A protein has these predicted regions:
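Phosphopantetheine-dependent thiolation modules in NRPS/PKS and related acyl-activating systems
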Residues: 1-18
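Channel- or pocket-lining gating/hinge segments that regulate access to a cavity or pore
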Residues: 85, 255-272
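Cys-dependent condensing catalytic cores that perform Claisen condensation/acyl-transfer
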Residues: 21-256
Length: 272
C-alpha cells in the first residue's frame, strides 16, 4: 500500500509440512482485486489504516456517550449486578450517518436498519468500487456475498412491548440479512449468506467464498465482516465471564495479559 514493501518471513513449525506449489493449479489461483474498511482511529480506508498501524496507536478510547453512559454501568467490582468493569474499547465514528438515497433505500427504512447493515453496505460497495465494479456494472452479475458477523446488539435496543415494531423490523434488524441487503441493493445474483461462527465468522466467510469461487457458483466474491458495539449488554456479559481486560488493552502471549479489549470495525475484500 502506497509504495511500502511488506516482507513476508517464512516460519517453519515443527511437524508441519508446507503445501507443495503444484497442489494448486494456475486456474485455481484467487486474488484480491479490491478492498475497503472502517476501523478505529479514523481509519476509513486501507491507506489510512496502514498509516494508523505504522503510527503505533491502538484506537482504544472511552465509551462515547452516544452509545451509553459509562458512568452508569461502570464498576470495578465484577460481582456487582448489571455492571461492567470495562470503560474503553475501539470505536468507529459516524455509524449514525448513511447515504440511503445512493442505495435506493427510503429514509423510513434506513432509520430502522441495524447500523451494521448500513456500514457493511457502504464498505462492501467501497470494495467493489475499488475493484472497478460500479453500480451500473454490478446489476445482474454473478457476484457472491459472504459476510461474517456474530453480534446483534441492535435487537437489544428495541423498547419492550413491541411498540417500535414496524413494516421493516423483520428485515432491518436481523443479522442474517447483512449479506442479502448488499445483494439486493446492488442487484447481485450470486450466493448470499451471513455466517456466524463467533470470533472466526469473517475467516469462515472467506473460506466459504473461496470454495464457492472454485466451484463456479459465482464469478467474483465480496467477503466482509462487521462488528458494532451498540449496547452495554455485551460488555456486562463478558465482564461477568471475566473475559475483558480491566486495563482495556490486549496483550496477547504476554505475561501481562489480563483479558481482551472489544472493538468495532468493518472490512471487505473482493476476490476473483
Amino acid at each position: 500500500i502506497r509504495g511500502r514493501r511488506v516482507l513476508r518471513v517464512p516460519v517453519r513449525r515443527r511437524g508441519v509440512r508446507p503445501l507443495p506449489v503444484s497442489a494448486t493449479g494456475a486456474d485455481d489461483v484467487i486474488v484480491v482485486v479490491g478492498m475497503d474498511c472502517r476501523f478505529p482511529g479514523g481509519s476509513s480506508s486501507p491507506e489510512a489504516y496502514w498509516d494508523f498501524l505504522c503510527s503505533g496507536a491502538d484506537g482504544v478510547v472511552p465509551v462515547p456517550y452516544d452509545r451509553w453512559d459509562s458512568d452508569v454501568y461502570y464498576d470495578p467490582d465484577v460481582d456487582q449486578p448489571h455492571k461492567t468493569y470495562a470503560y474503553e474499547a475501539g470505536f468507529i465514528s459516524g455509524v449514525e450517518y448513511f447515504d440511503n438515497a445512493f442505495f435506493g433505500i427510503s429514509e423510513s427504512e434506513a432509520g430502522q436498519m441495524d447500523p451494521q447493515q448500513r456500514v457493511m453496505l457502504e464498505v462492501g460497495y467501497g470494495a467493489l468500487a475499488a475493484a472497478g465494479l460500479g453500480k451500473e456494472r454490478l446489476v445482474g452479475e454473478g457476484v457472491g456475498v459472504f459476510v461474517g458477523c456474530c453480534n446483534d446488539d441492535f435487537k437489544s435496543l428495541a423498547p419492550a412491548g413491541g411498540k417500535a415494531i414496524g413494516v421493516y423490523t423483520a428485515t432491518s434488524g436481523d443479522v442474517a440479512i447483512l449479506a442479502n441487503r448488499i445483494s439486493f441493493s446492488l442487484g447481485l445474483k450470486g450466493p448470499s449468506m451471513t455466517i456466524n461462527t463467533a470470533c472466526s465468522s469473517s475467516l469462515v466467510a472467506l473460506d466459504v467464498a473461496m470454495l464457492q469461487l472454485r466451484s463456479g457458483s459465482c464469478r467474483a466474491a465480496l467477503v466482509g465482516g462487521v462488528n458494532l458495539l451498540l449496547s452495554v449488554e455485551g460488555f456486562i456479559a463478558t465482564s461477568k465471564a471475566r473475559m475483558l481486560s480491566p486495563t482495556g488493552r490486549c496483550r496477547t502471549f504476554s505475561v501481562d495479559a489480563d483479558g481482551y479489549c472489544r472493538g468495532e470495525g468493518c472490512g471487505a475484500v473482493v476476490l476473483k
